[in-house]
Design a protein with these regions (language model features):
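Conserved Rossmann-fold NAD(P)-dependent oxidoreductase catalytic core, especially the SDR/UDP-sugar
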Residues: 91-133
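Rossmann-fold cofactor-recognition segment
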Residues: 36-47
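N-terminal Rossmann NAD(P)H-binding glycine-rich loop of SDR-like oxidoreductase domains
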Residues: 3-23
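NAD(P)H-binding glycine-rich loop region in Rossmannoid oxidoreductase-like domains
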Residues: 45-85
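Active-site helix of classical SDR
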Residues: 139-142
Length: 304
């Protein structure tokens, strides 16, 4: 099987590429940066001409479309790039899919659940009026609508996955990255950070996420949507406390605030469907995964 992974150098894309290659697939990688490596193609998915080049002289059985601008704050500060990469990027990929007929796996986000309160099963959008709370969430929901419309009009075959708070080694720090990445980096460097006391998450270790993503290639059910999440539902303060405890630091630099506007407060995920169809397994607990992630950041950023 020949597979293309867009965003294949990213925090989720790179380990997914390794997992797919470990299974013996022929994997091509597309990303926006200049890089070297086997079967690497530079591409900004928001530019149609560059997307076309991914398919010159080669075909793929499955495209994992991960390339996107990530995160709520990033989407507010760089909204032009967010909409170009996410909305136009998916439309560009769908145009190629409509012409060439490959199957696609699309990574959406738990942010699409917006202001929904309760257990997040994949079908809640069909039963409840939901308001997405920020531009990043809106683009991901737009992407899902684009994909469903293409399937209805052209018969394209896509599986959508909604990732929940994926964390682990390999995610470089920036102020726009995920909460665990930010907490670890800022605690390591004695920098202040904010903990939102009324926010809860279902965190997923990267190895568990990519193993389930890779399983889709051989268990492909067109039109399906899956939550990929961990089994541990926790508040954000628990994450901060665990990280500080591992590092042997106090919380003097932590500001505690009740909640953050324009952000989904509670993400209680149901992952039963992914367990049933994709053999999703939550094998790494926070107690195991956080020390591994901290050790990686210490090595990368030279902190002890």
């Amino acid at each position: 099987m020949k597979i293309l992974v867009t965003g294949g150098l990213g925090a989720v894309g790179a380990p997914l590429v390794r997992e797919l290659r470990r299974r013996g697939y022929e994997v091509w990688v597309a990303d926006r940066v200049h890089a070297e490596g086997p079967n690497y193609l530079r591409c900004d998915v928001g530019v149609y001409r560059q997307v076309e080049r991914l398919f010159e002289d080669r075909t793929y059985d499955v495209v994992y479309h991960l390339a996107a601008e990530f995160g709520r704050r990033n989407g507010e500060d760089f909204y032009e790039t967010l909409w170009q990469s996410n909305a136009i990027g998916v439309k560009n990929m769908l145009r190629m899919q409509e012409d060439l007929g490959f199957r696609m796996v699309f990574t959406s986000s738990s942010e699409v659940y917006g202001d929904y309160q309760g257990e997040m099963t994949e079908d809640v959008m069909e039963k409840n009026p939901i308001r997405q709370l920020n531009d990043y969430a809106i683009t991901k929901w737009v992407n899902e609508q684009q994909i469903m419309n293409s399937a209805d009009r052209f018969g394209t075959e896509t599986v959508r996955v909604r990732l929940f708070n994926t964390y682990g080694p390999g995610e470089p720090y920036s102020e726009y990255r995920s909460v665990i990445c930010q907490f670890i980096y800022r605690a390591l460097h004695d920098l202040p950070y904010t903990v939102y006391l009324d926010h809860h998450r279902s965190s997923t270790y990267i190895d568990d996420t990519v193993r389930t993503l890779a399983n889709i290639a051989e268990n492909f059910k067109p039109g399906e949507v899956y939550n990929i999440s961990g089994d541990e539902y926790h508040d954000i303060k628990t994450l901060s406390d665990m990280i500080l405890d591992i590092l042997g630091k106090d919380d003097d630099l932590v500001e505690y605030v009740k909640f953050e506007a324009h952000n989904t407060r509670d993400k209680l995920a149901s992952n039963e469907k992914a367990k049933r169809d994709l053999d999703h397994q939550c094998t790494v607990t926070l107690e195991e995964g956080l020390p591994r992630t901290i050790a990686w950041q210490k090595e990368v950023y030279g902190r002890e």
